[in-house]
């Protein structure tokens, strides 16, 4: 959607919400009123193009420890974030993960300076310097703030058996990986914003033109503006091309799985559009997913494809709630306003506690 566009005061829609109302374009709709016309039951046989989760859905998705829980049943998150160039990304992503209740964070770096910073600011994290392949973790998270000294470690995440959240520079590695003819699988989660998705798609178009043609025909590589205009289309396209789950971050975050299931989550507040916000979200998502996968591993239940999307939606929701709570320092009195990433991370325990108390 490109300007000029008339903005409505109110939009009336029938039977079910239409796709654009689950994207950033809903800002043009004003107050939305849905009239079901008494037919929702008849729609249950159809698969929706997109799902929008409610607060109770988020509550049901959140894993809660019990009297028998210990740190390993709470999940171990391996993190390969930050670098000497971007040490803040490591500190913020790890702090956010720790504040979401994961059993352990194992942080990997060969940098003595970064290790000392981590010990000073996040002493709960456990440090390792060896190869990621020998570490015992439940879920990996990497790419946020990665520099030349850490990208090589991040390459391991592309073929690691564990689920992995691939942010920022790791998305580029994922695009290059497709040149081998391999696919990533739904347990690999790409978390680009529109600019990073543009770069990902351009790389795929260059290194895997056959796959591009098979899935997208003669479609040209979209610009960032194109992706902003059609986020649903391009998140789905990236998932189809890669076989991965794709979280396209924005005012409305679109999460697309390779089986076609797609979720939409409002971003909470536009004040989250700051440096460090994505690093914090990586830590939140990694911590929540590690807890979920640990529980499923204990029960020997299979991990459904939609699990990665649902937990991702929960992460986006908590991120937005913590941002609004950070303005007042009180989750019971949230407001829109400046929300620096470090403040957002501080509010996560209270926001999670309030979700559980509802």
Label for each model-derived stretch:
Residues 8-11, 16-168, 172-189, 194, ...:
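Small-residue (G/A/S/T)-rich helix-start motifs and N-terminal tracts that mark the onset
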């Amino acid at each position: 959607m490109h300007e000029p566009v008339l903005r409505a005061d109110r939009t009336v829609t029938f039977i079910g919400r239409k796709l654009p109302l689950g994207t950033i374009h809903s800002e043009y709709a004003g107050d939305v009123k849905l009239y079901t016309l008494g037919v929702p039951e008849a729609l249950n046989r159809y698969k929706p193009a997109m799902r929008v989760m409610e607060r109770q859905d988020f509550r049901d998705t959140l894993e809660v420890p019990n009297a028998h829980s210990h740190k390993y049943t709470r999940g171990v998150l391996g993190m390969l974030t930050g670098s000497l160039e971007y040490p803040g990304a490591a500190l913020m992503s790890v702090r956010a993960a720790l504040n979401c209740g994961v059993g352990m964070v194992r942080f990997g770096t060969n940098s003595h300076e970064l290790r000392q910073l981590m010990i000073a600011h996040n002493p709960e994290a456990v440090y390792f310097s060896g190869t990621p392949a020998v570490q015992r973790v439940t879920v990996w998270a990497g790419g946020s703030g990665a520099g030349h000294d850490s990208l090589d470690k991040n390459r391991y995440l592309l073929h690691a058996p564990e689920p992995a959240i691939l942010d920022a520079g790791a998305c580029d590695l994922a695009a290059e990986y497709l040149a081998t003819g391999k696919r990533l699988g739904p347990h690999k989660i790409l978390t680009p914003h529109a600019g990073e998705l543009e770069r990902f798609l351009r790389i795929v178009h260059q290194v895997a033109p056959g796959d591009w043609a098979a899935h997208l025909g003669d479609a040209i590589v979209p610009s960032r503006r194109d992706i902003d205009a059609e986020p649903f289309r391009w998140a789905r396209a990236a998932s189809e091309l890669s076989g991965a789950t794709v979280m396209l971050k924005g005012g409305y975050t679109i999460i697309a799985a390779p089986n076609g299931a797609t979720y939409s989550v409002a971003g909470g507040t536009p004040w989250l559009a700051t440096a460090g916000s994505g690093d914090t979200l990586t830590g939140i998502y990694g911590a929540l997913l590690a807890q979920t996968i640990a529980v499923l591993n204990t029960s020997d239940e299979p991990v459904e494809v939609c699990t990665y999307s649902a937990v991702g939606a929960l992460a986006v929701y908590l991120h937005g709630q913590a941002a609004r709570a950070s303005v007042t320092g009180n989750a019971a009195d949230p407001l829109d306003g400046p929300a620096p990433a470090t403040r957002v991370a501080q509010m996560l325990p209270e926001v999670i506690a309030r979700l559980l108390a509802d």
